[in-house]
């Protein structure tokens, strides 16, 4: 978990997190009540705008702060026991412990390599650059995304004096060094009087959907199930929605006095797999649409999106979809 990476959590997922996992300290998250989307084809003109006067749209949290809080709360929980697994651990030794269910989130261990290699995947040939801007104090509750010729850049507030940056840059035809990225951040800066730009980190971008969610009593989970482009801020939200469904299935089985076995995992796959695939493909379609738009010289596509954004019913639908996913 990089110190300059952040995640966005939708309002409904945030409420679930506080109720079922742990209370996130008010010092660790920042409220976002407005989202503005631009394209550099229509200079300084808002392409799409999402806001809810009654509620926050989502919350921004630093990855490392969330991980630190999660570890602290797990240690205090009577339901949690930390085990250090040996390097030579294998499936046979796990079976001897007779676990009802095994949930695997590690894409690099022996379980993943044996059972969870078949997936539908796509390489975006993008590098996501992340950093944090230190800037002059302003009212800072609006997230901004700009679709540039190099790729989408998101400005995600984390306080009145700090804003997280995620710049997904197309590197298929051109490579960028850190000074290029910093120049482009400054060029696309929507409103901030920048005092300092922290060290840049980067990671490759791809999307994937696992073909089979479980084998026997072993469930793949998290990024193993699905990875999506970060432009919509939905990766972690998809995982929390999966968690909500899995917890509900397990709670229902326990309440009925039923055994926790592979039937739990089968029900989970049936309730989530198709929806996750459709949702991830929708995010991919958004990326490819803007990717196509930047290659076309006229502004017609951008103007069509602007007209769609001005439709109140569609606007509200997209807000709900980003909050709760596909129901």
Outline where the language-model segments fall.
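Glycine-rich FAD cofactor-binding loop and adjacent beta-loop-alpha segment at the N-terminus
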Residues: 1-33
